[in-house]
């Protein structure tokens, strides 16, 4: 009896009160459960009798989905179409639609009936789906410089609403200008799911600079974020504008080496066959861009060219220089000369460039070659001449030997440091090295020989006065010289006599110096009296003495 009363109250409320007319919107995800709130999920009214969900069918007529009595736990599903197995009601009276699809994009109405009121809340459902990642397909194999070509097609699938596609080059958006860039977009819908696929075709006029450009396609959708395709690069075809010839062999090029010439063109794809002009002779090479000269000589120096097979005017030129160095030295090897003779050294050189010449003597660098017009013993040695240009060096040499008859230049004596011995020194010049013979026995202290100069020393203890001779010999001749050597006693007496003589000579020199000074003084004094005309004061005897002294001859 109570439920009947409630039902009658509901009908009265439905007749008295007008339902609300405001329509809200809810976004559902494709394939997910769509939640449609009733009155934005607010608290249920007091005296609730039941809640009913209904919808607008495709033909515009209303259709019932379910009713939930306030006193019952379960709702009664009244739908007979596809919603029968997909709809349910939540505890807050929200409508739950399982496995949402684009067919659910319609208006759903929640009717709330209580003892005091009847309200209807309409909600429009929209179903969104994020598109698949964008993919560039049907790519062009290559692009031609200056020619409008379809670069590729960008595709995204299964989206709602449809995605927008944007083409970019090096992250810069490409804009359709109707001439050099043309972008054509189309949208297709799946007949079953209703989902949209978007495709965009790009026609692009490439330039040479695009050889390293990267093209991408960006998909923009309300579900965000933006999705970007994998970057694509394309070979750019363009004709040759410049030919270049390179000498790839290591510089400098020397006689006997191989020289490789390489011809390159800036076209793409690059030409693979060329004409080489080898000093006026045309040589065609196919399927390669190099030509090799084997075992070059100085005669191969000259102008070389290369050009395209179909265009001889477009060519490149290189001058090839083969480096060479010819050197002749006179004399070479071992050279034997006598001291005082003349030696003429001549160096002849022929080179592809200015040659640098350096001389060394016995491994020591010389500023210049010595003057050999009058050879000395010090001129002997190994002379090496290095002549070089870049990459080439020649070394020639001669070993000069200067010979001469021995000649003694000095024979001296002095006491040893302890004063008990006499040291005789005999110095001589000659080559080969002279041998020495002394006329007395003694101790040979040292022998040195350098640059044709020999030094011999002999230590003796003479017991009497001696005459010592030094004899030097080599294969060319000999020389001898003598020196007197006194015993220690005689030498001491001689030294004392020398001291006495020195003292006497010193006294005589001092006396002469005093007399000279006195004479100069008297002479100056007399000249002073004549000049003044005055008579000197004094006796007549003093005047006579002065007069006599003036007439005496100087001693």
Swiss-Prot record:
Record-linked Gene3D superfamilies: Immunoglobulins
Record field: transmembrane: 500-520
InterPro entries found in the cross-reference section: CD80_C2-set, Ig-like_dom, Ig-like_dom_sf, Ig-like_fold, Ig/MHC_CS, Ig_sub, Ig_sub2, Ig_V-set
Domain Ig-like V-type per the UniProt entry, residue ranges: 23-127, 131-229
Bias (Basic and acidic residues) ranges: 532-555
Function: Cell adhesion molecule that mediates both heterotypic cell-cell contacts via its interaction with CD6, as well as homotypic cell-cell contacts. Promotes T-cell activation and proliferation via its interactions with CD6. Contributes to the formation and maturation of the immunological synapse via its interactions with CD6. Mediates homotypic interactions with cells that express ALCAM. Mediates attachment of dendritic cells onto endothelial cells via homotypic interaction. Inhibits endothelial cell migration and promotes endothelial tube formation via homotypic interactions.
Self-association and partners: Homodimer. Interacts (via extracellular domain) with CD6 (via extracellular domain). Homodimerization and interaction with CD6 involve the same region and cannot occur simultaneously. The affinity for CD6 is much higher than the affinity for self-association.
UniProt free text on domains: The CD6 binding site is located in the N-terminal Ig-like domain.
Protein name, UniProt field: CD166 antigen homolog
Organism taxonomic ancestry: Eukaryota, Metazoa, Chordata, Craniata, Vertebrata
Name of the gene: alcam
């Amino acid at each position: 009896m109570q439920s009947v009363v409630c039902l009658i109250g509901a009908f009265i409320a439905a007749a008295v009160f007008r339902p609300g007319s405001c329509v809200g919107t809810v976004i559902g995800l494709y394939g997910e459960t769509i939640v449609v709130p009733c009155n934005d999920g607010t608290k249920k009214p007091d005296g609730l009798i039941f809640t009913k969900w209904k919808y607008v069918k495709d033909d515009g007529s209303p259709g019932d989905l379910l009713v939930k009595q306030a006193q019952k736990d379960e709702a009664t599903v009244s739908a007979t179409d596809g919603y029968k197995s997909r709809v349910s009601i939540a505890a807050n009276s929200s409508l739950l639609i399982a496995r949402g699809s684009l067919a659910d994009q319609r208006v759903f109405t929640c009717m709330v009936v209580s003892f005091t009121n009847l309200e209807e809340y309409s909600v429009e459902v929209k179903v969104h789906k994020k598109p698949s990642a964008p993919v560039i397909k049907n790519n062009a194999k290559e692009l031609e410089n200056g020619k409008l070509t379809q670069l590729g097609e960008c595709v995204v699938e299964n989206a709602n609403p449809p995605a927008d596609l944007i083409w970019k080059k090096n992250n810069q958006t490409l804009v359709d200008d109707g001439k050099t860039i043309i972008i054509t977009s189309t949208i297709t819908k799946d007949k079953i799911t209703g989902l949209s696929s978007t495709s965009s075709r790009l026609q692009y006029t490439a330039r040479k600079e695009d050889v390293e450009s990267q093209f991408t396609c960006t998909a923009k959708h309300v579900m965000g974020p933006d999705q970007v395709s994998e970057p694509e690069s394309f070979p750019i075809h363009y004709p040759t504008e410049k030919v270049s010839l390179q000498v790839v062999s290591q510089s400098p090029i020397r006689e006997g080496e191989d020289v490789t010439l390489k011809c390159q063109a800036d076209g793409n794809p690059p030409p693979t066959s060329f004409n080489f002009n080898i000093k006026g002779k045309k040589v065609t090479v196919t399927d390669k861009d190099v030509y090799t000269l084997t075992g070059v000589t100085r005669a191969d120096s000259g102008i070389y060219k290369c050009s395209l097979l179909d265009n001889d005017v477009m060519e490149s030129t290189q001058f090839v220089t083969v480096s060479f160095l010819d050197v002749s030295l006179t004399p070479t090897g071992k050279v034997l000369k006598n001291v005082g003779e003349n030696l003429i050294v001549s160096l002849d050189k022929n080179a592809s460039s200015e040659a640098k010449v350096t001389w060394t003597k016995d491994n020591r660098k010389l500023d210049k070659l010595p003057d050999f017009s009058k050879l000395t013993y010090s001129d002997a040695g190994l002379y090496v001449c290095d002549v070089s240009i870049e990459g080439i060096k020649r070394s020639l040499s001669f070993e000069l030997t200067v010979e001469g008859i021995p000649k003694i230049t000095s024979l001296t004596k002095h006491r040893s440091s302890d004063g008990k011995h006499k040291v005789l020194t005999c110095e001589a010049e000659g080559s080969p090295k002279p041998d020495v013979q002394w006329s007395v026995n003694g101790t040979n202290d040292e022998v040195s020989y350098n640059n044709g100069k020999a030094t011999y020393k002999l230590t003796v203890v003479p017991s009497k006065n001696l005459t010592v001779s030094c004899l030097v010999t080599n294969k060319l001749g000999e020389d001898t010289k003598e020196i007197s050597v006194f015993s220690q006693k005689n030498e001491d007496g001689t030294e004392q006599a020398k001291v006495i003589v020195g003292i006497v000579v010193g006294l005589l020199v001092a006396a002469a110096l005093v007399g000279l000074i006195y004479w100069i003084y008297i002479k100056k004094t007399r000249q002073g009296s004549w000049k003044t005309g005055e008579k000197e004061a004094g006796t007549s005897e003093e005047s006579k003495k002065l007069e006599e002294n003036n007439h005496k001859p100087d001693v």
